[in-house]
Amino acid sequence: MPSLEDYRIPYPAAGPCQKRTVIYLPQQDSAVEQHHLRVQLIPGRHVRCEDGCFYQLTGTVSEETLQSWGYPYYVVTLDDIYPAQCSPSDPANPRTFVPLRESPMIPYNSKRPIVVYVPEDAEVRYRVWCSDVLQVQESQQELEAPAVSQSCPVPVRERQNNPEGHAHPVVVHSVESPEVSGHKDGDQPMKKSSKLKQSCSNSSRSLKHSASGSSPKNTPLFSRESVPPEHSLSAAQQRRRSNENSAIDETGGGASRKKRSDSTSSRKDDQDSGYEKKVKNLWNRARGNSSPKRSASPKKSGRDSRRNS
């Protein structure tokens, strides 16, 4: 803490029945000190007021200037005490410091101390006042200041009551997701990997059924239905679906066999029709060749009969 000798300012010594009080102010920005800060001097005296009423002192605070230096200092005189409020303000805590009625406001200057001369039984208190503009600027700076990064929470062990009689009453509260670690005693946590495996097996089964029922000659059947993990099929539904797929395969196989039989019958019909055509042609040729012989034979027989006659 600095002393008055550090400033090398020759302030006068305290007079009889007086004492010198020095106030050192913290350094601020020069513009802020000049325009936004003020110091209120509150001289007073210690008097115990048992009734709890609010009292004040009469007196004066005069400003004087140090010769050949131009620095101000203040001289306080205290007179009588009088009650400023008749009703007790705080009977349980009676006042012990009675302030002066007039408390002057002086400029804020941290470059030099504030020197006040008061009576020996008096005391000087002070209060620093700031304008609303400075308060707004400070609030804006607090809002614009970067937020302090919060550290990761550490798991905390808490011992809880165990009314159900489980073997492990200690519960560890961690930062994990509730789907993995949030479960009660005796319950198993959710396992997403098993559901994914089950859905993959279901989709592979449906693809196998469709591949077995298809052939190069028939139209392949593919299952485009995807089973989500949270709605997996039960065993009965899987058996029913496999039966339906097998029935579809059987009907598809019967249709293919029917088509093959139809194609073979059509081929046979074509072969039969060709054979019949050949037989008819031969028959027609045979009839054509035999008809003149039949017509010639009776003529020949007639000629022979005539000759014989």
Curated annotation (Swiss-Prot):
Biased composition (Basic and acidic residues): 156-167, 181-190, 261-279
A single MF term (Gene Ontology): serine-type endopeptidase inhibitor activity
Species name: Leishmania braziliensis
Family, similarity comment: Belongs to the protease inhibitor I11 (ecotin) family.
Top-level taxon of origin: Eukaryota
Protein name as catalogued: Ecotin-like protein 3
Biased composition (Low complexity): 168-180, 196-205, 290-299
Residue span of region Disordered: 140-309
TM region(s), chain numbering: none
InterPro entries: Ecotin_C, Ecotin_sf, Prot_inh_ecotin
Pfam family, one: Ecotin
